[in-house]
C-alpha cells in the first residue's frame, strides 16, 4: 500500500503538508494562482502591510551555496490587494487548495487594524500573524520582546475569533522556548510557524571584497540548508512545550523529502518551503511529494501520523 501524505490541520484534511513560505512566490495574483495550480497542499499570501510597500533597495536577495541571504523589507501590494484575492478565491469555490492569509504590520496598531478587517470580512480561512520579520530597518522583531508579544496577542484575541497562527523567529535558548511557550499556551492560538529566517547574517563576496545585498550594509536573513538544524530544534522545542491543540508549521531548510520527513518527525503538521521554492519554482512540490512518499514507503509508513512527533532520544 502506497504512503498517503494526507494530514489533518485545524479540522481540514489537506492532500499533503506542503505550502509556500510567505514571502516567496506569492507577491502577485499571478504567482498565487501558480501556487494554487501546483501540487502544494495549501498556499499563503505575501505578508501584507496596510499600504503597498516597495521594500528595501536592491540587490536585496542573493542565492548562496547552501541557501540564501535576503533583506527584502516586506515589499507587498498592500492588505486590500490580498484580501480581495482571498475573498474572490473563496467566492469562486476554488478551495480545494486552502489559502492562508499573512499580515505583518509595521506597528502594533497596524496589525490590530488589519486583523479587525479580516475579522469583519467574509474570509473564513486561516490567518498568520508575522511577528518575526528581521529585515525592516529600525523595526525590531516583536517576538523577541516577550512582554510585547503577550500584550499584542492578548489584544488580538479580545476581538479576533477566526483561526490564527503566529510566525516566530528562531530562538536559541531553552529559557526562551519556555517563556514563549508559557505565553502562547494561555491563548486560543491555532498554530505556530517555526521559523522565520535567521536574522542579520552576513555573506561576503571574496572577489569583490564586499557584501552581496545592499540594505543594512549587507546584513540579511539567512535561509535554506544553513538554517535546518535551528528550524528542527525550534519545531521540536515547541512541539514538546505547547498544548496539543496548538499545531506547528515547520519552515526552514526543506530541500528534499528527507528534510520534510525530519520536520514531521520533530512534530510539525504542515511544512512551508521558501529558499528552494525561489530557486526551483512551483515544480518543487511535485518532487518533494514524490521523495517523501518514497522515503515513507521504504520505512513502511502508510501515513504521516504513524511517525509525526515520534523523534527518538538516545
From Swiss-Prot:
InterPro entries: Aldolase_TIM, DHO_dehydrogenase, DHOD_1A, Dihydro_DH_chainA_dom2, Dihydroorotate_DH_1, Dihydroorotate_DH_1_2, Dihydroorotate_DH_cat, Dihydroorotate_DH_CS. Its cofactor is FMN. GO terms for biological process: 'de novo' pyrimidine nucleobase biosynthetic process; 'de novo' UMP biosynthetic process. FMN binds at residues 46-47, 130, 167, 195, 224, 252-253, 274-275. Binds 1 FMN per subunit. It is an enzyme of class 1 (oxidoreductase). The activity is independent of the presence of oxygen. The active site is at residues 132-133. Coiled coil: none annotated. Substrate binds at residues 46, 70-74, 130, 196-197. HAMAP family: DHO_dh_type1. S.kluyveri has two isoforms of DHODase, a cytoplasmic isoform and a mitochondrial isoform. Catalyzes the conversion of dihydroorotate to orotate with fumarate as the electron acceptor. Belongs to the dihydroorotate dehydrogenase family. Type 1 subfamily. This is Dihydroorotate dehydrogenase (fumarate). It comes from Lachancea kluyveri (strain ATCC 58438 / CBS 3082 / BCRC 21498 / NBRC 1685 / JCM 7257 / NCYC 543 / NRRL Y-12651). The lineage of its organism: Eukaryota, Fungi, Dikarya, Ascomycota, Saccharomycotina.
Amino acid at each position: 500500500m502506497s504512503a498517503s501524505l494526507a494530514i489533518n490541520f485545524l479540522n481540514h484534511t489537506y492532500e499533503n503538508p506542503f505550502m509556500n513560505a510567505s514571502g516567496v512566490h506569492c507577491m502577485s495574483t499571478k504567482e498565487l494562482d501558480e501556487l494554487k495550480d501546483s501540487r502544494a497542499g495549501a498556499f499563503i499570501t505575501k505578508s501584507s502591510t496596510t499600504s503597498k510597500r516597495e521594500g528595501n533597495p536592491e540587490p536585496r536577495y542573493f542565492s548562496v551555496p547552501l541557501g540564501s541571504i535576503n533583506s527584502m523589507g516586506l515589499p507587498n501590494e498592500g492588505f486590500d490587494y490580498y484580501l480581495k484575492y482571498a475573498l474572490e478565491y473563496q467566492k469562486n469555490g476554488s478551495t480545494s487548495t486552502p489559502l492562508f492569509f499573512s499580515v505583518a504590520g509595521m506597528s502594533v496598531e497596524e496589525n490590530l487594524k488589519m486583523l479587525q478587517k479580516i475579522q469583519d470580512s467574509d474570509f473564513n480561512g486561516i490567518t498568520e500573524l508575522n511577528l518575526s520579520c528581521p529585515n525592516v530597518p529600525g523595526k525590531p522583531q516583536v517576538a523577541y520582546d516577550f512582554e510585547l508579544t503577550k500584550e499584542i496577542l492578548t489584544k488580538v484575541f479580545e476581538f479576533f475569533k477566526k483561526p490564527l497562527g503566529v510566525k516566530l523567529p528562531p530562538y536559541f535558548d531553552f529559557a526562551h522556548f519556555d517563556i514563549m511557550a508559557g505565553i502562547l499556551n494561555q491563548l486560543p492560538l491555532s498554530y505556530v510557524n517555526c521559523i522565520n529566517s535567521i536574522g542579520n547574517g552576513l555573506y561576503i563576496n571574496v572577489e569583490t571584497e564586499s557584501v552581496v545585498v545592499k540594505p543594512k550594509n549587507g546584513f540579511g536573513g539567512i535561509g535554506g540548508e544553513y538554517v535546518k538544524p535551528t528550524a528542527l530544534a525550534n519545531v521540536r522545542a515547541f512541539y514538546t512545550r505547547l498544548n496539543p491543540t496548538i499545531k506547528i508549521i515547520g519552515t526552514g531548510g526543506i530541500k528534499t523529502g528527507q528534510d520534510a520527513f525530519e520536520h514531521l518527525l520533530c512534530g510539525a503538521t504542515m511544512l512551508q518551503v521558501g529558499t528552494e521554492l525561489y530557486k526551483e519554482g512551483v515544480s518543487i512540490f511535485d518532487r518533494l511529494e514524490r521523495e517523501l512518499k518514497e522515503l515513507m514507503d521504504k520505512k513502511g509508513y502508510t501515513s504521516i501520523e504513524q511517525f509525526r512527533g515520534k523523534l527518538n532520544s538516545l
